[in-house]
C-alpha cells in the first residue's frame, strides 16, 4: 500500500465535499418542501374538516333532536314484584315443609331466649326429671341453687315446684 501524500489527501477531501454539498442542499430543499407541503396539506385538511363540522353544527335544530329522541328509545315498564309479608319472608321452605305457616314464631322449649321469658319455663320442665338421689347430693343441690339465683337475678321467678323440691332435699341430707 502506498502512503498518500497530504496534497492528494486534501485534494480528495475537497472533491468529496464539493461533490456531496450540492446533493445535500438538494436533499434539504426536497425535505423542506415535502415537510412544508405536508403541513400545508394538514392545514387544508383540518380547515375543510372544521368547515364541515361548523356546517353540520349550524344545520342542527332542536326539533330534529326531539324527533330523534322519541324514535330511538323504547320505554320499558318495570315488572311488578309480589310483596311478601315480613313474617313469611325469612322462612325457608325446606325439610319437607310445603307452607311457611307451619313453622311457629314462638321459640322452642329447648332453645330459651337470651335472658328472656323462656328461661324459667325450661327449668321447670327439666326439674321434675331429677331423681331424689340427685337432689340429696351436694353437687346437684348447688347446681339447682345456682340456677335459682340466675333466674332471680334476671328478673324471672322460678316456678314453685322447683323451689319446693330444693327445700325438701335440704332437710333430709
Swiss-Prot record:
It comes from Coturnix japonica (Japanese quail). One of its GO terms (cellular component) is extracellular region. Keywords: Amidation, Neuropeptide, Secreted, Signal. This is Gonadotropin inhibitory hormone peptides. Residues 1-26 form the signal peptide. GO terms for molecular function: signaling receptor binding. InterPro entries: FMRFamide-related/fGRP (IPR026297). The modification Phenylalanine amide is found at residues 95, 115, 154.
Amino acid at each position: 500500500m502506498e502512503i498518500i501524500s497530504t496534497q492528494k489527501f486534501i485534494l480528495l477531501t475537497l472533491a468529496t465535499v464539493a461533490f456531496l454539498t450540492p446533493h445535500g442542499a438538494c436533499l434539504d430543499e426536497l425535505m423542506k418542501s415535502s415537510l412544508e407541503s405536508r403541513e400545508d396539506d394538514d392545514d387544508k385538511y383540518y380547515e375543510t374538516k372544521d368547515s364541515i363540522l361548523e356546517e353540520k353544527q349550524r344545520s342542527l335544530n332542536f326539533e330534529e333532536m326531539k324527533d330523534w329522541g322519541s324514535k330511538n328509545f323504547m320505554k320499558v315498564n318495570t315488572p311488578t314484584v309480589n310483596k311478601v309479608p315480613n313474617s313469611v319472608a325469612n322462612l325457608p321452605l325446606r325439610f319437607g315443609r310445603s307452607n311457611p305457616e307451619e313453622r311457629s314464631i314462638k321459640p322452642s322449649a329447648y332453645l330459651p331466649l337470651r335472658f328472656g321469658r323462656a328461661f324459667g319455663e325450661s327449668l321447670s320442665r327439666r326439674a321434675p326429671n331429677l331423681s331424689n338421689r340427685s337432689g340429696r347430693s351436694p353437687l346437684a343441690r348447688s347446681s339447682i341453687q345456682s340456677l335459682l339465683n340466675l333466674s332471680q337475678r334476671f328478673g324471672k321467678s322460678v316456678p314453685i315446684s322447683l323451689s319446693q323440691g330444693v327445700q325438701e332435699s335440704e332437710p333430709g341430707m
